[in-house]
Amino acid sequence: MIWKYLTQCLSQFKLLFWIFIISITLGASYWVSNIEMSYEFAKILPADDPDYKVYSDFKSTFGEDGVLMVIGVKDSTFFTANKINDWFLLTQKLKSLNGIQNAVSVLTALKGHRNDSTLKIETEPFMESPVASLSEIQKLKAELLNWPIYKHKLWDPEHHVMLIGVTFDSKTLNSANRLALIDSILMPCKHYENKYHTPLHYSGMPYLRTHIMKKIRHEMMLFILISALVSIGILWLFFRNFKMVAISLLTVGIGVVWTMALMYALGYKITVLTSLLAPLIMVIGIPNCIFFINRYRKALVENQNRNKAIEVMVSSMALTLLIANVTTAIGFAVLYYTNSAILQEFGITASMGVMLTFLITLITMPLVLHYINEPFEKTKKTTEWKWITLFLNRIETFVFHKRKTIYILTICISILGFWGMNYISLNGYVIDDFPKNDIAYTDMRFFENYFAGVLPFECIIKTQDSNGIFKNNARVLYKIKRLERMMHQYPQFSEPLSLVSGIKLAHQMDRGDSKFYSLPAVEDLKDLYERNSQTETPNPWLKPYLNAQQSQTRVSFQIADIGSLKFNALLNEIKPRIDSIFPLNTYTTVLTGHSRVFLKSQSYLQQNLIESLIIEIILIALVGLLLFRSLSIIVLSKLPCLLPLLITAGIMGFADIAFKPSTILIFSIAFGISSDGTVYFLTRFRNEIKRGLKFHEAIRVSIYETGQSMVFTTIILFFGFIVFGFSSFGGTSALGILVSITLVMALLANLILLPCILISLQNRIKPIKEHITPNTIIDDEHH
């Protein structure tokens, strides 16, 4: 048989296999050292999604919308010479940094006046040099109050809040340099904080993205270390043998290196999901080692011959573990069908990594065991676990004497699961992965309190003609004025920035009084344009709000992080009102921006969970069908796999855990791993029937023979995944806790519910022997 032949090859060509493994591992290690972090925001929506396409078109026309970082301070004693001057110098310092397009505070913002000789507008900043006297401070404050455009954009005079807006260069924004640049921004800000003992607040998409990436980088290394320590501890507890612990760690370590190198070869970068790959592969790979080592030790006790024990180990376990790893890999691979880039990258790499790690285990384990000289008596002693035997005795009692109770409990748990599942929240937030006490969370709430929010939201108005924005006596501008007045009714939105804002500012500059901060009449607008058309735009906000053909314009808002449910309800309310201002037969209006794309992703995830789970169930069922050739057995065997998922969904609902990229993985991972237990049990059960055991006796033997390794595996996986529960990211933490719970439920379902189902329906399904064909029999002669 192929497995026996493989064992012989490994024994005969040990040196060649070692050269092969070591060479690839060294090359892979070099690739791993070149893996980069992803500095772009997670792409959940597929590229062909209508809203994503609109957002992409917007960025190609007007540029990135998430380039603004904001720095704020609340200080009722701000208007003193030292604080004003230091705030001014801080703004200038930030503006001078490489990678920063602009930095502006209300102190460096533009004011202007009309030159009476040229009749053109001339501009200058409020401050060009530090102030010294009280009269200068009073004059400055009075001037600032005279310019309405800056209120609630760069400062909030009623609540004594000042703000600096820092605009990033888009090239720097999406590169590794952003992390160093953020540090360069924070350094002088911290100096200001320390000098005046006043906390500054930071937010905006560049800051939030950097905050996330720093956490990812820190947690990735931390989880790898903790996962390794947990694996060492549990392996030592199980085997009490340093050599066996070292073999297992060596095997999964090579698997991790190969997997990460594969990610590099595929051109993927480290994201919030792919950062989990290394500890995940480590956790999933360890059970392969446990099954092989347990079988090797048992065969060693029986045969007292190392070579024979290795041959029995491979022949007995290889196909079973292959099928189990295939089902686990399918759980990840189905994420490819989501058409979501971040999920596809994770799914492809994880599924291939699982199979690579299995292949490495299959080759490395026999190679290393050839050099291990373990005393037989010691091996026999360490394969006996009294507490597991007691546990399995209790399982046997439940299966053969408490089936009715088991079914009643299963029905009750299922009802609770369905009930809780109805409460699963689809209400996603941009920062709901952060704990409530995280600085990024509290700072965002600060800006929402005083400036409505920091998340970009855009309203695009498209006309049908070139220069359409200014045709028909600039009718579009007056419609935008109505739009802004209408949006002012919604406190979730900040004050807008648009062409109208810039023209109102120019009108005030031209007339010299704040009462002229308004959109002028048509004739006055034409006059203002003609007098200033040959000069540079007097307002830096005009140019970014027009496309090259002057057929499109944008009205930019910031919005609070109100959650996807409220956001969608808000869109449904304001879109018809916008369309009433801009009739569809003449104009096209589009609502977009990073906030809309991100929040739409939440509903997209729900749809893809259902699709990917259905595909996963079908694929794993097909694998089982190849093994057992019985549709009835396959259908029944899926019940113990689905019950843990139902329990998990119920817990998510009752615990108010929302769908997000990390929590959606719970179901794919858990179902794939739960199916492993089903494969282990049914394979053993089928082989016992093949040996000629009676139905009940075959089930009893299967419980005891597979139970020990399944318990070992569950303990390893439980503690491996529970590590993620300590993540500061809410989704990753939920992933770790819920997968751990699901695995325990899957263990109980496979050892209790699955045997109960087989016993109850033994007379209603075809005899198992009918489903055993020569090409599906596992060589279990020595198992």
Label for each model-derived stretch:
Residues S56, F62, P130-F242, R531-E616:
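Extracytoplasmic
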